[in-house]
Amino acid sequence: MLIFAAILAIFIYGMIAAMLGTILPDLSDRFHLSPSQNGTIAFAQALGLILASLAVGPLLDDEGKKVGLVLGLTFISIVLFALPRSSGFKSIVILLFLLGVGGGIVVTGANSLVSDVSENHRAMALNLVNLFFGLGAFATPFIAANLFGRNWVRLCYTIATLTVVTLAFHAATPMPGPTGSGRFVLTDVAPALGRPLLFMVGLFLFLYVGCEVGIWNWLVRHLIALGIPEKKALNILSVGFALGMLIGRAGILPILSHVPAITVTMTGSVAMAITTFLMLRTTRPAVALVLVFLAGISMAPVFPTTLAIVGDAFPRMTGTAIGFVITCGWTGLAVSSRIIGFIAGGDPRRLKKALMVIPGSAVLMFALDLAIRSALR
């Protein structure tokens, strides 16, 4: 039941992770938003993710995972019911900040729960559960394009309803309280977490999350700027990127029992750099679909496998350690959102240049992987 609870939470997080990129074109048209304002909205969501992930780690270690998951799902439900009633740019920024808070709590709580439940097969369990992130992320743009006719209001209410159902399930599911060895004690923070490895992994996720969520948030707008119809652009995001992540996380499961986790992240970094660079060079929808799909496969195992490395390296205060590196990831999203929005300015066609931040970050990730591998020896 605990793994199933984590799966439901990650599925909901997958749906909201793909949501901003899915509804951004319609929001931009309705409220006349520029790419620079889009960057501010993405920054607000990232700021919420940062603050939540930073604060929730000690809460999870001190009070248990259930408190965090219920709190995060409550935030998400409220925001999604309120978003269709937003009146303009400022209210959207506030609501996306709160959505980030809820998402940050949920993703940290769910991954920490799985890490504790499956200590002997942590990498496989985290990739299995995060497979459903890909399923949720696939569902959002696919439903918007093919079932709701790009009606973002219906999309918000549908995901909000699913979140309420998930919230009820978590509230009714018994979950273990904090363990004695992982319980947050302020005086233990420095010796438990003050290792260079944690900061190297944090910097790695700083780069990675900016890449992955950058595609979720900006790809559709970029494709539309190239002249690709919105429905086709949404399907490239869902059938291409989201489905690639879904298949990639399913395919990596048997490999993880034979290959070290650091080798998986190194391979993913190289593949990310190549596929995202080529993805941004093409203007043909069919080629873009294939390259976006391959980029999704490349990125699929990176995030959960990195969390597994943290879980193995920090058996004490695991929730706090995972919360820290995830916070670093959301910080990367905040920084990259500002950079991409600044480079693009008021012209969506400049996103082609701005999004080159993604393959550049992947190259730096590979260099960090080499340092992390040395630290693990």
Question: Residue locations for each model-derived region?
Answer:
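Extracytoplasmic gate region of multi-pass secondary transporters
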Residues: 20-21, 195-239, 243-246
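Interfacial helix-cap and linker-helix signal at transmembrane-aqueous boundaries
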Residues: 27-28, 59-60, 143-150, 223-224, ...
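Helix-breaking motifs and short loop linkers at transmembrane-helix boundaries and internal kinks
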Residues: 32, 64, 85-90, 119, ...
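Conserved MFS/SLC helix-loop-helix module at the cytosolic interface between two early adjacent transmembrane helices
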Residues: 51-90
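Helix-to-loop junctions at the C-terminal end of transmembrane segments
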Residues: 52-64, 248-260, 344
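Cytoplasmic helix-loop-helix junction between adjacent transmembrane helices
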Residues: 95-131
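Helix-loop-helix hairpin linking two adjacent transmembrane segments in secondary transporters
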Residues: 120, 127-174
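C-terminal transmembrane helical hairpin of 12-TM major facilitator-type secondary transporters
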Residues: 259-306
